[in-house]
Amino acid sequence: MIRFLGNIEVRADAKGRVFIPATFRKQLQAASEERLIMRKDVFQDCLTLYPESVWNEELNELRSRLNKWNSKHQLIFRQFVSDVEVVTPDSNGRILIPKRYLQICNIRGDIRFIGIDNKIEIWAKERAEQPFMSPEEFGAALEEIMNDENRQDGER
């Protein structure tokens, strides 16, 4: 199982090529993951990079919740899968971020790779603090979640 951790700053070149941080590359290699799936995040102005096996699990989960005979569900599935890029790191460990993604997420030059469990988020450096709470908000939210009385005893 892959678990990406960390917040690593890198620089994209003029063509949108960027080195995948070495710690993340090592994990991908250890898991024999060669292909990555890139898409615009559903909720944030960042890109999400999935190892192919993780993407397939996410896709299977989504598909299992959708009714293929429901037109709204068809639209949701189409939108989710239609704008993805399959990327393979080159021999130097670089990937190319397509221009449309650079524009949509306002990514230029310095960027941040943030490990989020089994996937990686790619942020414009100046927006990389946007998805975080203040330390006080984070502490209160975590306390609320971890002290939730509705959890089963085995989940603590």
Curated annotation (Swiss-Prot):
Similarity-based family: Belongs to the MraZ family.
NCBIfam families: PRK00326.3-5
Name of the protein: Transcriptional regulator MraZ
Pfam families, alphabetized: MraZ
SUPFAM superfamilies for the chain: AbrB/MazE/MraZ-like (SSF89447)
Oligomer and partners: Forms oligomers.
Record keywords, A-Z: Cytoplasm, DNA-binding, Repeat, Transcription, Transcription regulation
GO-annotated cellular components: cytoplasm; nucleoid
Natural source organism: Bacteroides thetaiotaomicron (strain ATCC 29148 / DSM 2079 / JCM 5827 / CCUG 10774 / NCTC 10582 / VPI-5482 / E50)
GO biological process: negative regulation of DNA-templated transcription initiation
